[in-house]
């Protein structure tokens, strides 16, 4: 299964974003940012790829200035691609 990693440069924003997803019933997990992404504060939010459109709209609507990008984490758990 592929996942989307949502990276921020702020741990506070990472946690707040995960809380916003939870409020909307979207399952997410706070994870270590994959080193292949080369961005962020070290923590990111991971969601199933099917929730990517919702996460994208939510990031835009909340205007987190520390947002660093979206990345696809492929099922092998090692391949990361910028979206």
Outline where the language-model segments fall:
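Absolute protein N-terminus
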Residues: 1-2, 83
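Amphipathic, hydrophobic secondary-structure cores in small proteins
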Residues: 2-5, 9-11, 18, 22, ...
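Residue-level marker of intrinsically disordered, low-complexity segments enriched
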Residues: 13, 24, 28-29, 70-71, ...
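C-terminal structural segments of small proteins and small subunits
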Residues: 49-83
